[in-house]
Swiss-Prot record:
Ranges where the record places region Disordered: 362-383
Modified residues annotated as N6-(retinylidene)lysine in this record: 328
Function: Visual pigments are the light-absorbing molecules that mediate vision. They consist of an apoprotein, opsin, covalently linked to cis-retinal.
Keyword annotations from UniProtKB, A to Z: Chromophore, Disulfide bond, G-protein coupled receptor, Glycoprotein, Membrane, Phosphoprotein, Photoreceptor protein, Receptor, Retinal protein, Sensory transduction, Transducer, Transmembrane, Transmembrane helix, Vision
Protein name: Opsin Rh3
Disulfide bridges in this chain: 130-207
Signal peptide boundaries: none
Organism: Drosophila melanogaster (Fruit fly)
GO biological process entries: absorption of UV light; cellular response to light stimulus; detection of UV; G protein-coupled receptor signaling pathway; phototransduction; phototransduction, UV; visual perception
Amino acid sequence: MESGNVSSSLFGNVSTALRPEARLSAETRLLGWNVPPEELRHIPEHWLTYPEPPESMNYLLGTLYIFFTLMSMLGNGLVIWVFSAAKSLRTPSNILVINLAFCDFMMMVKTPIFIYNSFHQGYALGHLGCQIFGIIGSYTGIAAGATNAFIAYDRFNVITRPMEGKMTHGKAIAMIIFIYMYATPWVVACYTETWGRFVPEGYLTSCTFDYLTDNFDTRLFVACIFFFSFVCPTTMITYYYSQIVGHVFSHEKALRDQAKKMNVESLRSNVDKNKETAEIRIAKAAITICFLFFCSWTPYGVMSLIGAFGDKTLLTPGATMIPACACKMVACIDPFVYAISHPRYRMELQKRCPWLALNEKAPESSAVASTSTTQEPQQTTAA
């Protein structure tokens, strides 16, 4: 630990010697004051004009990320395990569910880099750590958005066209391959710095693609990645889930109208009422998924557009940590959406982890048979 302090002090002395403005006073220093000179070129100048945050802020964020990591890995690990191990859940549609949980899980694999940097007050792992952080973050972020879009497409087909829209294992595998092929060009371009690059942001403890360099190439890159990794998936998700919700409520309205014509209270039997409940849960889960996706990625999208095209002074180091926290928080919440809205997942989890005391009752066989088409969409909608 003592050698680490000596090293930090040495780098700090060299850095401030080359950048005298980095030390504002004995107590106040600019971000990057302790970064080795050869690493400074990888940091956008925008961040180097801000004073470093209090040590307690970095410690707080590091501790928060430890919590995010544990919660996400536990929750998504359970989802991957249960959906892969349970025969009743190994359906083609659920391959997409597993991939989404895998993306959320892998998103947190890189957080030890952030945690280490936070507890060492800055860019401690340097350019190599930044590249690893950026590669994993880009793959998981873009792949998660595309996976959500394909899940919405699959649910739309199964619910609105149950006879023609059935998913097969071949289709699901092809979608997964396409998702990672779709993400790869963006990652390779940034890693090789042929178009864009991975750079530290905020408190210099996390990394993302460069949205601050003031040139045409950077602005074009930001516009393209924003469109293809955010606008396209968001448009698909919004369209397909809105169609699902519209279909469910149109179906309910048609049944009510027919019941009125026949002077009966309801056309549904007890089995149909179970199906009705499932349909309402589909609608609620669809809205929840849309909301979570928007909450997690809209702040990042807005921030990158401001950096490339707007007033950069709005992007303070503290403000840019908020979008990063939003993404990690949603990666923690997603598994609990499964647990709340997917009875079959809850049943399988209860079998394997009885100590969780989920108390999920097995559905009646008649209800299961009648709602097989409905529950299958419900599984992936909860993704």
